Amino acid sequence: MPRARNLIIGCDGTWNDTAGIERTNVPKLLNACATRHQIVHYEEGVGTAYLEALPGGIYGKGLDRQILGAYRFLRKRLNESGWASAQQNIFIFGFSRGAYAARRLCGLINHSGIPYRARDVELGWQMYLNQDVYSASHLQTNGRFFSTTIKFLGVWDSVKSTIDPDYADLTLSPCVRKACHAMALDEQRKPFPVLRFNASQRVNQQWFSGVHSDVGGGYPEPDLSDITLKWMIDQSWAEGLRLKASAVRALKPNPAGVLHNSLTGPWQSLGRKIRRVRKEDVVHESVRARCVEVASYRPRNASQWLNEFSDLA
């Protein structure tokens, strides 16, 4: 009887892939995964293919490709002979619009299940898009699809295109056992509102210092993004993800590192909006460490949280 194995999916952010020198936390985490009894699948970000470059960046065109690519991977692997579905643990990661794609993938799996046959992949997708509960239930009862659970969902600063329809975006899919979400405290681009989860005991959602790619990775200086990567590694390791010790040791998280300005160039003309930190939100301990080490760093949207510390007020 074979041991359990992990199926690991990574959906990268807009205009991100593994060809660039500066990689996001998605491929970094996948590359840190041990290879024994683990299979990794990577979906490059929307806008990386030539014909979807501009619409992918602006409107999120290409999300269907990411979702269906990952869905086909799961269908193939979960149906391989010698492996029962219960022996296979699913881990899904995503950044930016890739995080939104990862969340939609979870919604698809929860609604339609996994098809036994490759030709039913598109059917499962259409049932999800149409929210066709009757057909999904009927096809699972008749043995064309089967249900499964997702052990861990890890996302960095989820955003979506404003033209994308809503599919319970704020609610964690019931098939997901645990989710973690790292949110960018200092991102101010109006077209990049964070798509947070509603409060749930299964969701660990925290604010981190930095703009969008300081949190999700992609800048030459990984000081801040290594903080969130290490956090995500720790959270997923606790759920059974196996990682290379050398890759973890290579991280250099630094709360006092470079914090970039994303509100430059054409983004300035699209507007500015400071993200709201709610009273019940969790702010990661590294934010306080940055406030201590960088005297000029006092995020206005976290003023209520800062007031809890007399030495930072």
Predicted segments with their positions:
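Active-site- or binding-pocket-proximal scaffold segments within functional domains
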Residues: 1-313
